[in-house]
Swiss-Prot record:
Cell wall formation. One of its GO terms (cellular component) is cytosol. The keyword Nucleotide-binding does not apply. One of its GO terms (biological process) is regulation of cell shape. One of its GO terms (molecular function) is FAD binding. This is UDP-N-acetylenolpyruvoylglucosamine reductase. The gene is murB. It is found in: Cytoplasm. Keywords: Cell cycle, Cell division, Cell shape, Cell wall biogenesis/degradation, Cytoplasm, FAD, Flavoprotein, NADP, Oxidoreductase, Peptidoglycan synthesis. It comes from Methylorubrum extorquens (strain CM4 / NCIMB 13688) (Methylobacterium extorquens).
Amino acid sequence: MTAHSLIDAIRAAAPDLRGRLLENQSLADLTWFRVGGPAQVLFSPADEADLSAFLAALDPSVPVTVIGLGSNLIVRDGGIPGVTIRLGGKAFGSVEIDGETIRSGTAVPDMRLAKAAAEASLDGLAFFRGIPGSVGGALRMNAGAHGGETTDVLVEVRGIDRKGEVHRFTHAEMGFRYRHSSAPDDVIFTGATFRGRPGDREAIEAEMERVTAAREAAQPIRERTGGSTFKNPEGGKAWQLIDAAGCRGLIRGGAQVSEMHCNFLINRGGATAADIEGLGEEVRRRVREHSGFELHWEIKRIGVEASPA
């Protein structure tokens, strides 16, 4: 089915949709690597009710992919077939605080969540200042940094399944472990409730400044990068294993292993998604051969490879 006919079918099934539907929309500008092919159809729902109606009407055979800020993501050069959903706007991008309870939309950047908590003198969420993604991504992978993880402060998650039905997941039902949650893959997270603890605003903001300084000193944040590439294996640190295998500065096409922090891949300019993913696989191979450790991707890779020329 072509993008145009898919959109026609969606509009026929859900004529009252209020969100934006775009066909063959480039995704490169929506990822931090600035690479990747187009979304066959990109949908940005107006609010939760709009998303629910869309999913309820969508043919279940049409694949659905969800993206956030694109900071921990490689979109392959052939693009993403089916429907890609990107949440945004006030409906998914607001933060509300009531006492020690923080309610956030899943399109909220993690750094803004940390700032909002600090402004309310709520401690425990400063680590989010060091995570360059959105709340939705943090929920999906139990994101963490600088000694804190999402699981430490989460109370409840709200989401919608492929049938358009709304669900709530308790902390226990999320099944968090290191860089992973056990929530159903077909659920799109729309909101989350966190709990902070009373603290001193100046001390919290000082901790956030420390997190920011540590990140700027150790990570290539001014480069086009997707963030931390591989999970730390049990008994080792990914960057040390990569360095020991001689991969610091390794180049493939327009992609390079960062000289500054070798668990980061960067787009030097003109890289393709295949360059970046291929470089990552070469790093995995060299680490395996050098130390026996198997590195697993932390960066999510989605879409299809480009067709041969």
